[in-house]
Amino acid sequence: MAKIYTDREASLEPLKGKTIAVIGYGIQGRAQALNLRDSGLEVIIGLRRGGKSWELATSEGFRVYEIGEAVRKADVILVLIPDMEQPKVWQEQIAPNLKEGVVVDFAHGFNVHFGLIKPPKNIDVIMVAPKAPGKAVREEYLAGRGVPALVAVYQDYSGSALKYALALAKGIGATRAGVIETTFAEETETDLIGEQIVLVGGLMELIKKGFEVLVEMGYQPEVAYFEVLNEAKLIMDLIWQRGIYGMLNGVSDTAKYGGLTVGPRVIDENVKRKMKEAAMRVKSGEFAKEWVEEYNRGAPTLRKLMEEARTHPIEKVGEEMRKLLFGP
């Protein structure tokens, strides 16, 4: 069983009197920086000079420094810039300025797990990974709640790395909801696998293929859109609130029977086999290697696929339907 920590098992004491440098002030960086400051901790921001984020962080009362200087001033460093920017920034601005014994925190294990970032042995390396976008991290904190998070220790130089991870999780409000202890490998691999076979890749293709089937059978695209995309949110909300069995108890008997008998014929063992193949590509590092090479070439394949997604017929129909639902 997973080890779950709440507010009672976490303390801010390990961070008291320490300087926390948040590297990056995007959606996640801003949310975590504000929450940590509101929890009574000393927070500075590390950014490239002159950008909009610099102006925003300054206007919100933070002391802002160039990344290297922020790292030199810090006892605890949160690396909250986009994954694919991290290796270059790490090599050029973070690693040369690290002090012995500092704590470095990541929100995702990708670069460390796959060896794109190789931390020195004389620091703590931890992860606090909120399981929600930055907007929710901030809003839930302000509401007196929190979003769940994963915590992990990659390197425990001080002997207190887990205490630092739990303190950061408490500082951003995550222990109010509960944090699960994991590893860099488990967080990274399950995150990528979940995105690919269910959350982004799986759902997207299931919806698109369902739309195509209905339209090819002669049904109106607008009706098809409502049936396979718009109503998907209603079902997902039920699953989120009640679980799969609870969702089944919230739909009609006709929907129950049709779903339970036809669903396994469509998402069959062959689909499960392909899911496992995709999962093994992640676990082996094959996907990471492919993606890093793609990114370093300027992401031509990604741009092509994004254009195909943008021009899919469901997007034109969806644009009109969303105007009806939400206004122009």
Swiss-Prot record:
Signal peptide span: none
Reactions catalysed, as given in the entry: (2R)-2,3-dihydroxy-3-methylbutanoate + NADP(+) = (2S)-2-acetolactate + NADPH + H(+); (2R,3R)-2,3-dihydroxy-3-methylpentanoate + NADP(+) = (S)-2-ethyl-2-hydroxy-3-oxobutanoate + NADPH + H(+)
Binding residues for NADP(+): Y25, G26, I27, Q28, R48, S53, D83, M84, E85, Q86, G134
Annotated TM spans: none
Residues that hold Mg(2+) 1 according to the record: D191, E195
PROSITE patterns: KARI_C, KARI_N
Keywords: Amino-acid biosynthesis, Branched-chain amino acid biosynthesis, Magnesium, Metal-binding, NADP, Oxidoreductase
KARI N-terminal Rossmann domain span: 2-182
Top EC class for this record: oxidoreductase
Keyword Magnesium set for record: yes
Binding site residues for substrate: S252
Annotated KARI C-terminal knotted domain residues: 183-328
Pathway stated in the Swiss-Prot or TrEMBL entry: Amino-acid biosynthesis; L-isoleucine biosynthesis; L-isoleucine from 2-oxobutanoate: step 2/4; Amino-acid biosynthesis; L-valine biosynthesis; L-valine from pyruvate: step 2/4
Entry keyword Repeat: no
GO BP annotations listed: isoleucine biosynthetic process; L-valine biosynthetic process
Pfam families reported in the protein's UniProt record: KARI_C, KARI_N
Cofactor: Mg(2+)
UniProt remark on cofactor binding: Binds 2 magnesium ions per subunit.
GO molecular function terms listed in the Swiss-Prot or TrEMBL record: ketol-acid reductoisomerase activity; magnesium ion binding; NADP binding
PANTHER family: KETOL-ACID REDUCTOISOMERASE, MITOCHONDRIAL
Family matches, as HAMAP family: IlvC (MF_00435)
Annotated family: Belongs to the ketol-acid reductoisomerase family.
Annotated protein name in UniProt: Ketol-acid reductoisomerase (NADP(+))
